[in-house]
From Swiss-Prot:
Main location: cytoplasm
GO cellular component: cytoplasm; cytosol; nucleoplasm; plasma membrane
Chain segments carrying region Disordered: 1-20
Consequence recorded when altering R109Q: Reduces binding to phosphoinositide
Function: Acts as a lipid transfer protein. Preferentially captures and shuttles two lipid second messengers, i.e., phosphatidylinositol 4,5- bisphosphate and phosphatidylinositol 3,4,5-trisphosphate and increases their levels in the plasma membrane. Additionally, may also function as a lipid-presenting protein to enhance the activity of the PI3K-AKT and MEK-ERK pathways. May act as a regulator of tumorigenesis through its activation of phospholipid signaling.
InterPro entries (alphabetical): TNFAIP8-like (IPR008477), TNFAIP8_sf (IPR038355)
Name listed for the protein in its UniProt record: Tumor necrosis factor alpha-induced protein 8-like protein 3
UniProt family annotation: Belongs to the TNFAIP8 family.
């Protein structure tokens, strides 16, 4: 079902958009339409990343741009993250996963839940932040995602998975995000508020 080969180049309109006009919601809609136009079933045409997740992605974009000093790279990372999330969502909703893969889905859910709670705890409890702990959890999530989509998606999408998780699991990026006196504290606050909402709503 993977349709990477027919995509536009990364220089498509919108790539150079600034942090105040970047919208993960719009990017998700564009990616979704492109992916859905190339698969037989249209039953997931109403699938969108929810508003809370969209807000988290937007804040991650801003922090990524601050960390990389590269608007285009920040956009590409978030675009890859959204594409991967949508493709996995399509596979799941269309019941494309085998029984063995459904077990991996549950492992991934638990690992994402653990990672989310750890992220919030590190923000809420002073002096507990440990880059290595959070980086390890994110790499474990990455390995489970690779295992889950192994027989469904192309090497190009596996490359996207690496691109996304290697960035967010990078200890220097995590230090930028959690820096107690850095510019990203307001972003981290909004990210953790969003994560808490997803946890309360049993989405994570």
């Amino acid at each position: 079902m993977d349709s990477d080969s027919g995509e536009q180049s990364e220089g498509e309109p919108g790539t150079a958009a600034g942090p105040h006009v970047f919208s993960s919601k719009n990017l998700a809609l564009q990616a979704q339409k492109k992916i859905l136009s190339k698969i037989a079933s249209k039953t997931v045409a109403n699938m969108l990343i929810d508003d809370t997740s969209s807000e988290i992605f937007d804040e991650l974009y801003k922090v990524t741009e601050i960390h990389t000093h590269n608007k285009k790279e920040a956009h590409k990372i978030m675009k890859d993250a959204i594409k991967v999330a949508i493709k996995i969502g399509i596979l799941y909703r269309n019941k494309q996963f085998s029984q063995e893969e459904v077990i991996i889905v549950e492992k991934l859910r638990k690992k994402l839940n653990q990672t989310a709670m750890t992220m919030v705890s590190f923000y809420e409890v002073e002096y507990t932040f440990d880059t290595n702990v959070l980086s390890k959890l994110l790499h474990e999530c990455k390995d489970l995602v690779h295992e889950l989509v192994q027989r469904h998606l192309t090497p190009r999408t596996h490359g996207r998975i690496n691109h996304v998780f290697n960035h967010f699991a990078d200890v220097e990026f995590l230090s930028t995000l959690y820096g107690p006196h850095g510019n990203c504290r307001p972003n981290l606050k909004r990210i953790c508020e969003g994560i808490n909402k997803l946890l309360d709503d049993k989405i994570l």
